[in-house]
């Protein structure tokens, strides 16, 4: 009887979670129910799964609305009908046109029109839906001949009055209006609540034919769906055998090129992998990935292949990855095993400005009917909810700010705020908008609209209406097509080296950079600012603590830095064991046997699986469940709990001490979703080496590429400082030498025009276009004649030094500009002779370095004419410099530091911070700020601080544990020397990088309960 149920996937309309809807059906013995969310199919598969578990017949369809007006409801008779709905909604979304009041032709769908707007003539599969309150209208003659076409249409949208109020709030949010301004047309009827079949039979008892019509329609729907059946494109060629033959041929050709013909281990590993790939029908998946890489190579694009697929020698021989599984002894079972139902992940990275071309190739090659992005759903988050709900209740911006900043306890007497809080809690976690997965692409065997409708976001690539978890449930395995800025850094750096020095660097030849001697020395000292994945303060500190000087240690470090290892409490233990390899005992002989390379500590996902199988005695199927959990793919808490129970049972049966087993499983759990497989770390390490090689031998070109491609850990100012420390002559943006991006000419680094704040991109493009067409600008007069510009923008260009190439002082240029712009007349359409440039003679009006620095601070956000320290009132530069720290272990020192970044870290005693600074010599150092110190001496924004603290040297890495600190004042802005209102405003432009961490505090050594020497556990 329930042919029109909305879930909360009727975005900003429905209020009932899918599981709750089905649960209500089960509680009231509903035999069949239809999910018909508004203009989408997002909740269908969750609904089907829930109905199958509840013993309810699932019926699927959609409610078609146009500008919130109900047109009709579509119900799928079968799988073909569901595909028809998918294609219809897709066409609707793609064209974004208005709907006709009547439905188009459907072969395998029922159409139900609302009673109030039903057409006079109905086709065979068209019906009229009537609500109980409309039954009195059936007495007219018009309806007698249509009685066999009328069915019950009771809408379920909310559960009770409170739910209805939530629905109204959602409608107000969607319409961006006040609750008080909503009309009946905007909202559902208050009576659209859950009703049982018995209630509906009573309401329609005078019209048994309508009841019978409804039952017949329900009974005739036979939509069924089988989960976990592979839906990906099956074959790259015409069939499995030719796929297998081609894959084998390509793999062996690649193997010979890499290893030679007589490499026995490579042959054995390759044969083993190919056998399993064939048995699991994954050849097509490998070949499609290979095909994408072939296109990429043909375009000259650089890529990085990572993920669990990088454990594969097949992937290595095909050129998908650049990680040799033999060199690193990569664990085959992490990549592929007989219990694995889905193919291994190949996460392929391209440069951020090349990925769209790769995507266009995939859509073109495999057909738009068969390719789409995986979907995702953004949900309402509490803080944003409070603001959204506050708006619809009419709160002002200041009230909303107060509401989001202060806890609810501050507003207990305000009834409106209490309502906002009440409905905010109800709304938290509700779907808000459909969006797209960051990188997941689905390539299907059958048309993808057989399974869903498609959305078309602004970029134009189609997106399915379900997320990655649902995709996997129904049989799709995504291809991860990613982009990152790090590859852009490497690519552009190689181009700049060729342009600037005439040297062609084959950076894709990893033998050039991996384990290169000078690079290893840079690693060891943490001199890695700008380098992919190894430039953060935490990573640079780890590299120094480990004295990392080779590829294999870097591979381990790339995984150790992940939260999984740190959350287990084992990062510090790894550092200790690495530095004291003869001063510890393994937890158990299995750890020595399986994890000897990592000193008996679980570092990679493979390590967790090895310990689960060999220490815990779990079967390989449980290992696969753990693999999925560590990859962030498992949603089955019951499945994980069952694995945990079996782990303890097997450990007890093996006679392992219970305390040891509990500690080991605690470490295993910490890896869930926050760890790398070894091959993934190895792929990252190779890219890190590539960028480090360029930084080591071609620092100016590399840092220029980092600035231009963005995406580094630090703000642009830090990379410009790094360039200056590497010998660059840093110059302000220049109308004659700069592009939008930063430009390197020899050792002169001209900052990009786009770095200037407050000047439109259109104007900057006009300046460059005119320069390209008619040559450099010879004077300010010449510039004004050629570029239409307002005085405000021109003054900014002058202040930043963009006309420095003209050889004139800023003050002189400012006067010239004002005179010229106030007198400027429209240029004649045609002139036979170029008018002579008008020149003015002015007295010399020099500006100080400090004035230039404040101009730069205002327009760039940082000074380049001098270091920030030179703007301080004090001449003090610190008692101790960075170069002295290693000799001052345990001593209290005074230092002066310019704040680069600070990172928040939760502890059991409150928040603490790690700070990164540069000293007056331009060198980096790190500080630790414990909660007690921060209470009295907090950070108060960017700038230079006087620091008092104790130097602690931990495994070759010094940091300063801060006791006291204070930000030091800058000099008065010399440009506003007599203007007390403005002479300190520019200082607020000084920036800092702040990162916040939202996680549980890492365990202390005392909480881990595993000393370095083996405990004498009792059974």
What are the residue ranges of the model-derived segments?
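Domain-core and long-helix interface of multi-subunit machines
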Residues: 1-35, 39-54, 87-168, 202-207, ...
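Divalent metal-coordination and catalytic microenvironments
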Residues: 4, 37, 58, 78, ...
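Metal-dependent DNA phosphodiester-chemistry modules and their immediately adjacent helices/loops
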Residues: 66-68, 75-98, 174-194, 340, ...
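Short alpha-helix plus adjacent loop in nuclease-associated cores
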Residues: 11, 64-77, 156-177, 346-348, ...
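Noncatalytic, beta-rich nucleic-acid-contacting surfaces in large DNA/RNA-processing enzymes
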Residues: 32-35, 51-53, 190-191, 241-1019
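Glycine-rich, histidine-containing beta strand-loop boundary motifs that form or position
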Residues: 36-39, 60-64, 76, 152-156, ...
């Amino acid at each position: 009887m329930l042919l029109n149920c909305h879930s909360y996937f009727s975005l900003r309309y429905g209020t009932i979670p899918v599981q709750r809807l089905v649960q209500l059906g089960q509680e009231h013995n509903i035999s069949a129910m239809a999910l018909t969310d508004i203009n989408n199919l997002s909740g269908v598969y969750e609904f089907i799964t829930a109905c199958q578990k509840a013993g309810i017949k699932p019926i699927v369809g959609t409610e078609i609305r146009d500008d919130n007006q109900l047109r009709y409801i579509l119900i799928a008779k079968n799988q073909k009908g569901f595909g028809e709905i998918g294609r219809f909604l897709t066409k609707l979304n793609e064209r974004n046109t208005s709907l006709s009041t009547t439905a188009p032709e459907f072969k395998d769908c029922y159409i139900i029109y609302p009673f109030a707007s039903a057409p006079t003539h109905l086709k065979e599969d068209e019906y009229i839906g009537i609500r109980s309150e409309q039954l009195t209208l059936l007495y007219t003659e018009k309806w007698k001949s249509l009685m066999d076409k009328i069915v019950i249409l009771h809408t379920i949208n909310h559960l009770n009055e409170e739910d209805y109020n939530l629905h109204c709030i959602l409608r107000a949010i969607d319409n961006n209006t006040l609750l008080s301004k909503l009309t009946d047309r905007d909202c559902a009827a208050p009576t659209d609540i859950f009703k049982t079949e018995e209630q509906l039979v009573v309401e329609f008892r005078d019209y048994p034919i309508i009841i019978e019509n409804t039952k017949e329609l329900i009974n005739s729907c036979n939509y069924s769906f089988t989960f976990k059946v592979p839906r990906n494109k099956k074959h790259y060629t015409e069939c499995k055998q030719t796929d297998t033959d081609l894959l084998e041929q390509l793999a062996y050709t690649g193997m010979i090129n890499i290893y030679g013909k007589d490499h026995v281990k490579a042959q054995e590993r390759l044969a083993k992998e190919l056998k399993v790939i064939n048995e699991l029908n994954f050849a097509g998946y490998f070949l499609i990935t290979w095909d994408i890489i072939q296109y990429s190579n043909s375009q000259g694009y650089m890529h990085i292949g990572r993920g669990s697929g990088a454990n594969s020698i097949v992937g290595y021989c095909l050129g998908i990855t650049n990680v040799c599984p033999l060199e690193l002894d990569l664990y085959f079972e992490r990549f592929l095993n007989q219990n694995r139902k889905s193919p291994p992940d190949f996460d392929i990275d391209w440069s951020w400005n090349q990925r769209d071309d790769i995507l266009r190739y995939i859509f073109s090659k495999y057909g738009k009917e068969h390719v789409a992005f995986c979907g995702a759903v953004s949900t309402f988050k509490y803080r944003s909810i409070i603001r959204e709900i506050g708006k619809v209740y009419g709160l002002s911006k200041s009230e909303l700010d107060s509401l989001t900043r202060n806890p609810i306890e501050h507003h207990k007497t305000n009834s409106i705020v209490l309502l906002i809080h009440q409905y905010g809690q109800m709304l938290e976690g509700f779907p808000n908008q459909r969006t797209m997965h960051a990188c997941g692409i689905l390539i299907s065997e059958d048309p993808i609209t057989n399974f869903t409708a498609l959305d078309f976001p602004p970029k134009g690539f189609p997106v399915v209406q379900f997320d990655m978890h649902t995709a996997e449930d129904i049989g799709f395995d995504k291809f991860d097509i990613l982009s990152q800025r790090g590859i852009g850094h490497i690519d552009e750096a190689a181009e700049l080296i060729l342009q600037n020095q005439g040297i062609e660097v084959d950076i894709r030849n990893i033998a050039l950079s991996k384990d290169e001697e000078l690079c290893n020395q840079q690693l060891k000292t943490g001199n890695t600012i700008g380098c992919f994945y190894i430039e953060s303060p935490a990573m640079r500190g780890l590299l120094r603590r480990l004295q990392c000087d080779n590829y294999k240690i870097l591979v381990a470090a790339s995984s150790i830095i992940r939260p999984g290892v740190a959350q287990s409490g084992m990062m510090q233990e790894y550092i200790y064991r690495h530095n004291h390899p003869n001063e510890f005992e393994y937890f158990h002989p299995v750890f020595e046997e399986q994890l000897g390379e990592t000193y008996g500590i679980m570092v990679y996902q493979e390590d967790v699986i090895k310990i689960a199988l060999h220490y815990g005695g779990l079967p390989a199927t449980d290992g696969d469940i753990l693999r999925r959990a560590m990859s962030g793919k498992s949603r089955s808490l019951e499945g994980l709990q069952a694995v945990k129970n079996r782990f303890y049972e097997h450990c007890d049966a093996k006679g392992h001490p219970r305390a040891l087993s509990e500690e080991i499983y605690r470490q295993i759990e910490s890896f869930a979703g926050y760890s790398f497989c070894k091959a993934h770390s190895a792929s990252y390490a190779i890219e890190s080496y590539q960028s480090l090689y360029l930084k080591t031998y071609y620092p100016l070109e590399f840092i220029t590429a980092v600035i231009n491609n963005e995406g580094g850990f630090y703000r642009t100012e830090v990379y410009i400082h790094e360039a200056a420390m590497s010998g660059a002559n840093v110059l302000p943006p220049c109308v004659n030498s700069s592009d939008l991006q930063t430009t390197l000419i020899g050792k002169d680094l001209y900052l990009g025009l786009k770095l200037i704040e407050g000047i439109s991109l259109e104007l900057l493009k006009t300046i460059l276009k005119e320069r390209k067409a008619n040559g450099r600008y010879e004077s300010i007069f010449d510039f004004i004649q050629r570029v239409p510009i307002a005085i405000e923008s021109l003054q900014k260009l002058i202040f930043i030094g963009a006309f420095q190439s003209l050889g004139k002082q800023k003050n002189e240029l400012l006067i010239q500009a004002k005179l010229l712009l106030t007198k400027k007349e429209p240029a004649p359409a045609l002139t036979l002779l170029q008018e002579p440039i008008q020149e003015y003679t002015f007295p010399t009006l020099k500006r100080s370095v400090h004035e230039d620095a404040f101009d730069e601070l205002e327009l760039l956000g940082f000074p380049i004419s001098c270091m920030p320290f030179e703007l301080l009132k004090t001449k003090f530069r610190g008692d101790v410099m960075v170069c002295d720290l290693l000799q001052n272990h345990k001593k209290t020192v005074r230092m002066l530091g310019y704040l680069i970044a600070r990172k928040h870290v939760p502890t059991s005693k409150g928040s603490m911070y790690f700070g990164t600074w540069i000293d007056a010599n331009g060198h980096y150092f790190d500080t630790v700020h414990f909660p007690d110190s921060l209470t009295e001496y907090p950070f108060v924004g960017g700038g230079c601080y006087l620091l008092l603290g104790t130097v602690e040297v931990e495994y070759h890495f010094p940091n300063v544990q801060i006791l006291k600190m204070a930000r030091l004042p800058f000099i008065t802005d010399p440009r506003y020397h007599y203007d007390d209102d403005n002479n300190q405003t520019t200082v607020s432009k000084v920036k800092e990088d702040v990162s916040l961490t939202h996680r549980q505090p890492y365990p202390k050594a005392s909480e881990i309960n595993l000393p370095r020497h083996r405990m004498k556990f009792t059974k």
